[in-house]
């Protein structure tokens, strides 16, 4: 018979007791009552927070948006095809956050910063909440530095400053995205990090934009965030906030950033879809009551920070699409009232061949000349006045048959000024050469050049200045003023080039 040794048994029991660890994991779980149209109704989840992330059995993630007495309304960030009635849902205890860092530059990602360009994972160590409060009044500084778009009409008449929010508004196919992309291309070498957010667009359109940025070397300082038309409404709703969060990370490091939201009409439509499916009461144009707050909390995050916080900035260019030029619709009026100005693109001007089709009469920048270099201020004031007078005279000239010489001269100059504001797509012009062309136009140097030859003349003049008078560009780049020496060089160049052009 085997002898039982009590000391051995007691040591084994003691060892077992010492190694025993009791860990209780408590999960806040619920049950799916119904699911469909990107919305799930969940029973349970008693301790869930507003906007908390929840996880379904199949791994689909959702956001708890409606916290009601007897159930929770969750919007799905996936197709949710394998979610069934009765399946369990787990609250994660986290609010939506995304990874941020330098590694994201040059990549194409979705609204949750997951790469969609096939170049592998993005390795970052930091993360930020998608929804974070905007900088307060004390943390801000007034907008004082220009953000050059490279588009003469904008930089001269509707200047944009670093930290400003400037709306780009117009009908479909009027060149809104082209203005935004040109602005991104013009930031090359300016130490500005750009974020392009595509909301509800065709995947082919986004691919085209990415190709343009890659071919022109702009992807080296740009992050593209895409929530395509085929993506769930929740991702289209989140994408702009993701863009703001990425830009905010760089802004708080003292860097300058530019964010393009293309376009906020689609985000509002995605939010409307979610709200109606969650049975929230509809308001004007069936949008929910908080659609103003949807955009204001996004655009208020754009700022120019004070020097104590590093002096970084985030400039926002939201895009809004109008229907038949109606800027008094709900979303356009909301965004106009939130932003610091708007660039209005007109389909009539676009069809008449004036591209970019900027309607200078309705467009405005509420920051104004604080966002211009001194050289541009010196020449732009006269341009605005002459174009305004030209628009009035043109309307009057349609009815009058015999016009006096002064009026004819003014109309002729106005036509030439219109020509110098025309610009091909994807070819931004440096500010020093914009100053030169406006100076030539407003001081009558183009009055004897045929209207159809003006575009060729100003393009040639820019090349002539670049090769024969490099000192002119150097003076404006360093002093930012059109001083006597620069003006003398410019006059010389115009006279010399004109002689060869008309010969």
Swiss-Prot record:
One of the record's GO cellular component terms: proton-transporting ATP synthase complex
Top-level taxon of the source organism: Bacteria
Broad enzyme group: translocase
EC numbers: 7.1.2.2
Activity modulation notes: Inhibited by dicyclohexylcarbodiimide.
Protein topology in the membrane: Peripheral membrane protein
Annotated thermal dependence: Optimum temperature is 55 degrees Celsius, activity was detected from 4 to 95 degrees Celsius.
Site (Required for activity): 363
Catalytic function, reaction form: ATP + H2O + 4 H(+)(in) = ADP + phosphate + 5 H(+)(out)
Record family assignment: Belongs to the ATPase alpha/beta chains family.
Record-given protein name: ATP synthase subunit alpha
Organism: Thermosynechococcus vestitus (strain NIES-2133 / IAM M-273 / BP-1)
């Amino acid at each position: 018979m085997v002898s039982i040794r009590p000391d051995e048994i007691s040591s084994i029991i003691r060892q077992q007791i010492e190694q025993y660890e009791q860990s209780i994991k408590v999960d806040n779980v619920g049950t799916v009552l119904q699911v469909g149209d990107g919305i799930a109704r969940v029973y349970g989840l008693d301790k869930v927070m507003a906007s908390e992330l929840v996880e379904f059995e199949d791994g689909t993630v959702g956001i708890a948006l409606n916290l009601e007495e007897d159930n929770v309304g969750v919007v799905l960030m996936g197709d949710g095809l394998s979610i069934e009635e009765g399946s369990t849902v787990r609250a994660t205890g986290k609010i939506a956050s995304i990874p941020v860092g330098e590694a994201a530059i040059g990549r194409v990602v979705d609204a949750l910063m997951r790469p969609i360009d096939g170049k592998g994972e993005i390795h970052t160590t930091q993360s930020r909440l998608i929804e974070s409060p905007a900088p307060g009044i004390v943390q801000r500084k007034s907008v004082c530095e220009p953000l050059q778009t490279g588009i003469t009409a904008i930089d001269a008449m509707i200047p944009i400053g670093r930290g400003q929010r400037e709306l780009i508004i117009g009908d479909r196919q009027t060149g809104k995205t082209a203005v935004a992309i040109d602005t991104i291309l013009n930031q090359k070498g300016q130490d500005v990090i750009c974020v392009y957010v595509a909301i509800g667009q065709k995947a082919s359109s986004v691919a085209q934009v990415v190709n343009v940025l890659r071919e022109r070397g702009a992807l080296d300082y740009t992050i593209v965030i895409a929530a395509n038309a085929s993506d769930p409404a929740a991702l289209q709703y989140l994408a702009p906030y993701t863009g703001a969060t990425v830009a905010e990370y760089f802004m708080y490091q003292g860097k300058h950033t530019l964010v393009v939201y293309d376009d906020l009409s689609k985000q509002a439509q995605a939010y409307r879809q979610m709200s109606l499916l969650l049975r929230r009461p509809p308001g004007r144009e069936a949008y929910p009551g908080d659609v103003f707050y949807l955009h204001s909390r996004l655009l208020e995050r754009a700022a120019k920070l004070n020097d104590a916080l590093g002096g970084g900035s985030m400039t926002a260019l939201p895009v809004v699409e109008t229907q038949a030029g109606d800027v008094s619709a709900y979303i356009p009026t909301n965004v106009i009232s939130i932003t610091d100005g708007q660039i209005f693109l007109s389909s009539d001007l676009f069809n008449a061949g004036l591209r970019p089709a900027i309607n200078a009469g309705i467009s405005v920048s509420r920051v104004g000349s604080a966002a211009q270099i001194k050289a541009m201020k010196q020449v732009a004031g006269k341009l605005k006045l002459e174009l305004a007078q030209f628009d009035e005279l043109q309307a009057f000239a349609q009815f009058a048959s015999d016009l006096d010489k002064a009026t004819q001269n003014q109309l002729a100059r106005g036509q030439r000024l219109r020509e110098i504001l025309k610009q091909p797509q994807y070819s931004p012009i440096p500010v020093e050469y914009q100053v030169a062309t406006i100076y030539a136009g407003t001081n009558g140097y183009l009055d004897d050049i045929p209207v159809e030859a003006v575009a060729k003349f100003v393009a040639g003049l820019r090349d002539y200045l670049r090769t024969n008078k490099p000192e002119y560009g150097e003076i404006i780049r360093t002093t930012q003023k059109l001083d006597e020496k620069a003006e003398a060089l410019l006059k010389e160049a115009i006279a010399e080039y004109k002689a060869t052009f008309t010969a």
